[in-house]
Amino acid sequence: MSNLGKVIQIIGPIIDIKFDSENLPDLFNALEINAGDRKVIAEVEQHIGDDTIRAIAMEDTEGLKRGMEALDTGKSVSVPVGKEVLGRLFNVLGKPIDGAGEFTSEESYPIHRPAPSFEEQSVEPEIFETGIKVIDLLAPYQKGGKIGLFGGAGVGKTVLIQELINNIAKEHGGLSVFTGVGERTREGNDLYYEMKESGVLEKTALVFGQMNEPPGARMRVALTGLTMSEYFRDQGQDVLLFIDNIFRFTQAGSEVSALLGRIPSAVGYQPTLATEMGALQERITSTKNGSITSVQAVYVPADDLTDPAPATTFAHLDATTVLSRAITELGIYPAVDPLESSSRMLDPRIIGEEHYEVAIKVKNILERYRELQDIIAILGIDELSEEDKLVVGRARKIQRFLSQPFTVAEQFTGMQGKYVPIKETVRGFKEILEGKHDNIPESAFLFQGTIEDVLKKAQQMEI
């Protein structure tokens, strides 16, 4: 027996629907509103009174009017999962939007699911090797961890994301899910075609709810991407989940909260900010079967790190990767700031004494170089003591050795991409710190993989 209701009020994306008081739909149930030539999906958010519910539309409410029929589907929004989703582009409801033909999947999961229980979770901290030297050495990622990716426009966030997708696919046989939350459609379009060109698309599922979508879609699209990731994790895969941008998830939640009439909290955000963020982040974790490692681009409004949105996000992050414009100006890519980026995994009990010592010494030498730069700018390098000259020489080599050619950027740079295992990364930097390569020109260190590549380059330069 189908449970039908009638639309009694529409205010933008908010729809009030009257049902029989005996058959009120459950919270978070999906409703189908028949709008003639199309069906609009809405999600139940509140029960108001004995026989009325308030729902938020997941699609445009254009063309809806009072008196239209709404069908209670009896379950929450469900999206397709499984290997069929790879290489395809979906919206919040799991419908393909890439125009690449029909789509069928054997299974679908509801987007609202409980986080794994304590017994199911894997608590052993394990390094997630990315093959990117600057990340693996100074701010390593945790398997099943959450990483914040900070950076302005044009500093290389997208290329870094693509390289991570490429590396997890090729080196770990893992899969990726990219979730575009409230960002520009043009950027999503560019990313889709760049992924197609660089060959990583068939190992990735993409889910988009962009800036032009209603707030309900932007609020729930992160859950759609997460649900697809959870399926792969439960099948024993290591999954990389990208969320771009986590701030827009909070922003959409704030819009919905205001539309539902909740009293705003600090800086106008929703009073349920911490709860909503926790419900999303707690589902991103490793279990005994597989892992979801999440990389989340974080927009910081007005560069204010104390704003409730980024501040709530920070509480959940295990590592931060900060991209710096000053480093792009030096022509060093990836433009990761080695001193600003950090990780909870940089602990001798997890990564081992040798790796920890090398990382700390690299940070110290770069910090000292930063302090000396003012003196060099005013007096010149010749005025430095012999010890400081040595520090500057090694720091400049380290700075250049932190650069690396990326596989996904081969067609632009003409350089073959390099994947560097952690062991090789630590050994290379240890040798530079010990002064074994003080006689090699610093230009030989730029855009190389291992220290052997540097020595080869130096030999070629001598010829």
Swiss-Prot record:
Organism of derivation: Clostridium botulinum (strain Langeland / NCTC 10281 / Type F)
Pfam family, one: ATP-synt_ab_N
Function of the protein: Produces ATP from ADP in the presence of a proton gradient across the membrane. The catalytic sites are hosted primarily by the beta subunits.
Membrane topology summary: Peripheral membrane protein
Record-level GO cellular component terms: plasma membrane; proton-transporting ATP synthase complex
Membership in a protein family: Belongs to the ATPase alpha/beta chains family.
Matching Gene3D superfamilies: 2.40.10.170, Bovine Mitochondrial F1-atpase, Atp Synthase Beta Chain, Chain D, domain 3 (1.10.1140.10), P-loop containing nucleotide triphosphate hydrolases (3.40.50.300)
Protein name: ATP synthase subunit beta
Positions annotated to bind ATP: G151, G152, A153, G154, V155, G156, K157, T158
PANTHER family (UniProt xref): ATP SYNTHASE, ATP SYNTHASE SUBUNIT BETA, MITOCHONDRIAL
EC assignment: 7.1.2.2
UniProt enzyme class: translocase
Keywords: ATP synthesis, ATP-binding, Cell membrane, CF(1), Hydrogen ion transport, Ion transport, Membrane, Nucleotide-binding, Translocase, Transport
InterPro entries listed in its UniProt record: AAA+_ATPase, ATP-synt_VA_C, ATP_synth_F1_bsu, ATPase_a/bsu_AS, ATPase_alpha/beta_chains, ATPase_F1/V1/A1_a/bsu_N, ATPase_F1/V1/A1_a/bsu_N_sf, ATPase_F1/V1/A1_a/bsu_nucl-bd
Subunit record text: F-type ATPases have 2 components, CF(1) - the catalytic core - and CF(0) - the membrane proton channel. CF(1) has five subunits: alpha(3), beta(3), gamma(1), delta(1), epsilon(1). CF(0) has three main subunits: a(1), b(2) and c(9-12). The alpha and beta chains form an alternating ring which encloses part of the gamma chain. CF(1) is attached to CF(0) by a central stalk formed by the gamma and epsilon chains, while a peripheral stalk is formed by the delta and b chains.
Catalytic activity of the protein: ATP + H2O + 4 H(+)(in) = ADP + phosphate + 5 H(+)(out)
Subcellular location: Cell membrane
Source taxon at top rank: Bacteria
Main location (coarse class): membrane
One annotated GO molecular function: ATP hydrolysis activity
